[in-house]
Amino acid sequence: DDTVLEKSGVRMEGISRVFDHMKGRCVLGYKLLLCAFFDGKTTIPFDFSLHQEKGKQGDCGLTKQQRRKAYHAKRNNGSPDYERFQECKKPKMEVAVDMLRRGWKMGLHAKYVITDIWFTCEQLMACVRSIGKGAMHFVGLAKLGKTKYTVSGRKKNAAELIAAYERERGKVCRKYRCRYIRLNGNLGDTPVRIFLIKYGRN
């Protein structure tokens, strides 16, 4: 998962304006990417990274004067602090993949990788299934977007799957007060089990 670390000092190294979904606007700070192990009772963070966002203009949302005054340091290539700073500029998805692979090598052999909507994509699913020869499974929320899933030999997005299978396979879950459709299919080359869930009347 990732979260916003809001800061007030523009001179901090790697600082940028990042989008805060809770506030609906950009704030000064970092994006914290956290990978944690959960056994049903205890959550143990085992890896993290800080990230900046370049923005549409590639200026991190800062003025020239602010960027010039920001802290800069020369580092030896390959040193831990050099690698950590380079990591700050990498895409979060790329770093998330590295975290999962490091965790497996450390002996954290989870059965499932759970993420939010932003990380649910074919790239991360394929990575998770490749670790430990398929020992881990991926669980994540997905948007009702344009992503195509192959079900019964045909490619359809979520809305099209609902229209095609709601009457035939729609079921009610009284415990969670929802209606759902369960389908087996593929996202690219990765086999997936799809749950299309509707809570309440809307």
Model regions and ranges:
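Short, surface-exposed basic-aromatic patches at helix termini and helix-loop junctions that form
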Residues: 105, 125-137
